Amino acid sequence: MKLKTRLILSGTILISLAACYFLVLLVLDLEITRDLMTDYVDPRPLQTSYHKLCVIVPYRDRLEELREFSPHMSKFLHNQNVSHHILIINQTDPLRFNRASLINVGWNEADRLGCDYMVMNDVDLLPVNPEVPYDFPGIGVIRHITSPQYHPKYHYEKFIGGILMLTLKDYKKLNGMSNKYWGWGLEDDEFYLRIIDSKLNLTRVSGLSTDSSNTFRHIHGPKRKRDYTPKKNDKNQWEIKRKRDHVSGLHDVRYLIDSRQLLDFSGTSVTIINVALHCDLNWTPYCKS
């Protein structure tokens, strides 16, 4: 009986010693891990959410502006901890400039890259007030960033040009933008009608500490001549352009990708998508200069 008791006590003591030994090892391991974590610094920028923004820039022959836009925009978004891609949609064909179709192409590229929201951002318009929001706007919300009270030039009530943000899902719901606008102007006004018809929530940035003179910087040079559309002497264009387009949009934009390339501007990498658009001369004969 005494021998059995001694064996039981010995076993208990051994188990206790083993438990103490593993406890000491665990404490030491935690201390080492804590020291390693203290010395480790994550080199990646802090992300406020899992959302990813694609900055879509419709573009042609604006290299001087692009050199300034790219590093400025990248720094601005990094300061807001916004995960992003900058996509320059470069029109390479000889047709008149078609901003809306290029943005439709940009949506396809943004979807391919896994972005869940997008901002249409003209290359000559730079946000300078850090309060200007580029974070995720939410489903069903369209955020006009260059609202009339802050845009350097345009202040009319229905203006939604310059910089406009929404989710990729909502852009698809709107069927994107009309493809009939060749030349400069009016595509935003038609897109405004699409938004109103859709019942999506159009919001405008407000409550900033700045005004139209110092919220954005407009770097469009006076030597940059705009190809206004419609031509003033073409009554047919006026009739076509002023009507709501229920036919064309994201689903039927026709184009050919010539190439994709990465360009570096002062340490900022942007993706250039070289695009040749297609024009239906029977529908929009004014696509040629």
Swiss-Prot record:
Gene3D superfamilies membership: Spore Coat Polysaccharide Biosynthesis Protein SpsA, Chain A (3.90.550.10)
Record has Glycosyltransferase as a keyword: yes
UniProt cofactor(s): Mn(2+)
InterPro entries given in the database record: Galactosyl_T, Galactosyl_T_C, Galactosyl_T_N, Nucleotide-diphossugar_trans
Pathway(s) where this gene product acts: Protein modification; protein glycosylation
Recorded catalytic activity of this chain's protein: 3-O-(beta-D-xylosyl)-L-seryl-[protein] + UDP-alpha-D-galactose = 3-O-(beta-D-galactosyl-(1->4)-beta-D-xylosyl)-L-seryl-[protein] + UDP + H(+)
CC annotations in GO: Golgi apparatus; membrane
Keywords: Glycoprotein, Glycosyltransferase, Magnesium, Manganese, Membrane, Metal-binding, Signal-anchor, Transferase, Transmembrane, Transmembrane helix
Transmembrane segments: 7-27
Topological domains, Lumenal: 28-289
Regions of this protein lying in the Cytoplasmic compartment: 1-6
Top-level taxonomic group: Eukaryota
Carbohydrate attachment residues: N81, N90, N201
Gene Ontology MF terms in the entry: galactosyltransferase activity; metal ion binding; xylosylprotein 4-beta-galactosyltransferase activity
Mode of membrane association: Single-pass type II membrane protein
One GO-annotated biological process of the protein: morphogenesis of an epithelium
The EC number(s) this enzyme carries: 2.4.1.133
Sequence ranges of Basic and acidic residues compositional bias: 227-236
Residue numbers spanned by region Disordered: 214-236
Binding site for Mn(2+): D124, H218
The protein's role, per its UniProt record: Glycosyltransferase required for the biosynthesis of the tetrasaccharide (GlcA-Gal-Gal-Xyl-)Ser core linker of heparan sulfate and chondroitin sulfate. Required for embryonic development. Involved in vulval epithelium invagination. Required for axon regeneration after injury.
The protein's name in its UniProt record: Xylosylprotein 4-beta-galactosyltransferase
Gene: sqv-3
